[in-house]
Amino acid sequence: MKVINLIPTLTLTSLIILTLPITMTLLQNNKTNCFLYITKMAVTCAFAISLIPTLLFLQSNQEAYISNWHWMTIQTLKLSLSFKLDFFSLTFMPIALFITWSIMEFSLWYMHSDPHINRFFKYLLLFLITMLILVSANNLLQLFMGWEGVGIMSFLLISWWHGRTDANTAALQAMLYNRIGDMGFIMMMAWFIIHLNSWEFQQIFLTNPKNTTLPLLGLLLASAGKSAQFGLHPWLPSAMEGPTPVSALLHSSTMVMAGVFTLIRFYPLMENNLTIQTSTLCLGAITTLFTAICALTQNDIKKIIALSTSSQLGLMMVTIGINQPHLAFTHMCTHAFFKAMLFLSSGSIIHNLDNEQDIRKMGGLYKTMPITSTAIIIGSLALTGMPFLTGFYSKDPIIETANMSYINTWALLITLIAVSMTASYSTRIIFFALLGQPRYPTLIQVNENNPYLINPIKRLILGSIFMGFFISMNTIPHTTPQMTMPPHLKFMALAVTLLGFTVATELNNMTHNLTFKQPSRMHTFSTTLGYYPTTTHRILPYLSLTMSQNLATTIMDSIWLEKMIPKNLTTMQKTAASLVSNQKGLMKLYFLSFLLSITLGLLITL
């Protein structure tokens, strides 16, 4: 059998294995504990099988397309189920399966007391299937099905603890912001079906239509909603109300990458459209700076990591904006490892400290939780781009390529400022959570000696150290960037990172025991997330409701209910009363006048 035939066969085999636990729940009751282990084993087997087509592709460099089920025909439009197995899909699928395997094993420890843990695992598996459909889709309809699938599963998993009002509000907020982005996606689908009469990627890219600014703007809007870019970003920090495994899987390594992945998928249309490239660059630059500023003063450990995720997503958008989609994809893959590990480590701390998420109430955990502390330190160093960790192999080329770029200097400048802030908020987590004296109640028993907790974190530690090298070595850039930066400037990047660590540590030491009488405006701006939630979720609805109430009061009450009926009726009654009041009741005078008129008439006739 040829290599090209093995790739689709093994890929579909891994997808079929993932559907087996779902099928099992339809045939029999899934309330037994064995369902959890069957689901985890299915994901593990699918991961092992998915490695084979990935390695075969890297060896042969032959893409594969599967189109084996014709769905329906509408006039001249043929809709079919088709998969595109290229570098992007075959590289991302094993990464998604590996991270899901680790997070499911972590969930056996984190969610062990939840009475509905079987349903939780089923939701995670359904999300994974829809995510794999999204990355392997070969047409817009199938891509949209995966796109909506991950959105629905995100809604269900954020609101998992539906007894909490904040969780329900966060899930609804995520759904509404993503619906705004879906408007752009539907507009893009409508444009392509009107102008090209096809949703197949090959036909769209081969036709290469002109004036694609409108559909690509719709795609950018959709990606901004799904990947939490500026303007549509507030849902991502709020989504931390869900369980930590949900944050680790959906909101750091897979679902939020869907918007960036879709932009990477459409790079053949974007590479010649300077308007879209500039818009993507500026949007990503604003996002990465804004969310980095907001992360500097947050005290919730999960929100700090969530805002750093949004900042890294902005960095990926910047990379796409400077026409380096393969570099953005490399950063997307490497980022998944250490960000999932950071979330699992924070979940370990939160669970051991009785659901405490404030980093000011932690401290001294490097003694009681050494493995978790090691994971947080390695993840933070990888996030800052420390040499020879996973993040270095993608973040350093992005910075170098951006510095050598000659377009939109202000966007590149604020991107570099945002990248330098990464070391500050990473050091802040390490300083407050791991160092110093314990600030949590002494009665809390901290224990991380559980294989379901330690093993996933250990696997992700290995991925955060070694996978960046392997991914970067097998990624061929679409356009070769001009690497003309002098060596001393390259060392300056490392020096700036170390300087950020040093400054953040000194500031934390200096201000640790100080109390601020009145925070500065910049501190308040960062703490309140740039006043964005207050403006969009409080002030604008308040103004809208106030205006609606005033209009309703003025039109309904003052005009209709008051003027039209009571006052108008009173006016009519006054008019009738004035007419009636002219009758004085002087009967003798009336009869005398009547008699005089008759007499005068008779005299005239005579």
UniProtKB/Swiss-Prot annotation:
A single MF term (Gene Ontology): NADH dehydrogenase (ubiquinone) activity
Protein keywords: Electron transport, Membrane, Mitochondrion, Mitochondrion inner membrane, NAD, Respiratory chain, Translocase, Transmembrane, Transmembrane helix, Transport, Ubiquinone
Gene Ontology cellular component list: mitochondrial inner membrane
Enzyme Commission (EC) number: 7.1.1.2
Catalytic activity: a ubiquinone + NADH + 5 H(+)(in) = a ubiquinol + NAD(+) + 4 H(+)(out)
Residues in coiled coil: none
Membrane topology category: Multi-pass membrane protein
Transmembrane segments: 3-23, 38-58, 87-107, 124-144, 180-200, 216-236, 244-264, 276-296, 304-323, 328-350, 369-389, 404-424, 460-480, 483-503, 586-606
NCBIfam families: NDH_I_L (TIGR01974)
Assembly and oligomerization: Core subunit of respiratory chain NADH dehydrogenase (Complex I) which is composed of 45 different subunits.
The name this protein goes by in its record: NADH-ubiquinone oxidoreductase chain 5
